Amino acid sequence: VHWTADEKQLITSLWGKVNVEECGSEALARLLIVYPWTQRFFSTFGNLSNAEAILHNPHVHAHGKKVLTSFGEAVKNLDHIKQTFATLSKLHCEKLHVDPENFKLLGNVLIIVLASHFTKEFTPACQAAWQKLVSAVAHALALGYH
């Protein structure tokens, strides 16, 4: 992926303001609520029976933070996203058998979360840069399936 200086700046400046715990938890919860079939990958998380249960589930909260923390590695390594996610790709492909389409869904949910948290800063140019980033991360995570 080729990044312009403007794209890198838009991504890193917004990332510096992101509360990883809050946004990560919200993004994963939204994924599980909006796309309920994704819940099958989280069978050990306990009660995911409704939106309220998901929003208050400590496992969702903790894993959302973990997911967004790893996403931060992409922000730090914009020029090496494939290598950054090689191990996670292998895990999600070979052990967890996660449908790679779910990576795209999570990326799109993350865009919505960021837009809702950073209404003024999340300009169309910022959205375009972040959309490019979440697409690159989804692609890198799906490489283990090819």
UniProtKB/Swiss-Prot annotation:
<keyword id="KW-0561">Oxygen transport</keyword>
<dbReference type="GO" id="GO:0042744">
    <property type="term" value="P:hydrogen peroxide catabolic process"/>
</dbReference>
<dbReference type="InterPro" id="IPR050056">
    <property type="entry name" value="Hemoglobin_oxygen_transport"/>
</dbReference>
<dbReference type="GO" id="GO:0072562">
    <property type="term" value="C:blood microparticle"/>
</dbReference>
<comment type="subunit">
    <text>Heterotetramer of two alpha chains and two beta chains.</text>
</comment>
<dbReference type="GO" id="GO:0019825">
    <property type="term" value="F:oxygen binding"/>
</dbReference>
<dbReference type="InterPro" id="IPR002337">
    <property type="entry name" value="Hemoglobin_b"/>
</dbReference>
<dbReference type="GO" id="GO:0043177">
    <property type="term" value="F:organic acid binding"/>
</dbReference>
<feature type="domain" description="Globin">
    <location>
        <begin position="2"/>
        <end position="146"/>
    </location>
</feature>
<dbReference type="GO" id="GO:0004601">
    <property type="term" value="F:peroxidase activity"/>
</dbReference>
<dbReference type="GO" id="GO:0005344">
    <property type="term" value="F:oxygen carrier activity"/>
</dbReference>
<keyword id="KW-0813">Transport</keyword>
<dbReference type="GO" id="GO:0046872">
    <property type="term" value="F:metal ion binding"/>
</dbReference>
<keyword id="KW-0408">Iron</keyword>
<dbReference type="InterPro" id="IPR012292">
    <property type="entry name" value="Globin/Proto"/>
</dbReference>
<comment type="similarity">
    <text>Belongs to the globin family.</text>
</comment>
<keyword id="KW-0349">Heme</keyword>
<dbReference type="InterPro" id="IPR009050">
    <property type="entry name" value="Globin-like_sf"/>
</dbReference>
<dbReference type="GO" id="GO:0031838">
    <property type="term" value="C:haptoglobin-hemoglobin complex"/>
</dbReference>
<dbReference type="GO" id="GO:0020037">
    <property type="term" value="F:heme binding"/>
</dbReference>
<keyword id="KW-0479">Metal-binding</keyword>
<feature type="binding site" description="proximal binding residue">
    <location>
        <position position="92"/>
    </location>
    <ligand>
        <name>heme b</name>
    </ligand>
</feature>
<comment type="function">
    <text>Involved in oxygen transport from the lung to the various peripheral tissues.</text>
</comment>
<feature type="binding site" description="distal binding residue">
    <location>
        <position position="63"/>
    </location>
    <ligand>
        <name>heme b</name>
    </ligand>
</feature>
<dbReference type="GO" id="GO:0031720">
    <property type="term" value="F:haptoglobin binding"/>
</dbReference>
<dbReference type="InterPro" id="IPR000971">
    <property type="entry name" value="Globin"/>
</dbReference>
<dbReference type="GO" id="GO:0005833">
    <property type="term" value="C:hemoglobin complex"/>
</dbReference>
<protein>
    <recommendedName>
        <fullName>Hemoglobin subunit beta</fullName>
    </recommendedName>
</protein>
<dbReference type="Pfam" id="PF00042">
    <property type="entry name" value="Globin"/>
</dbReference>
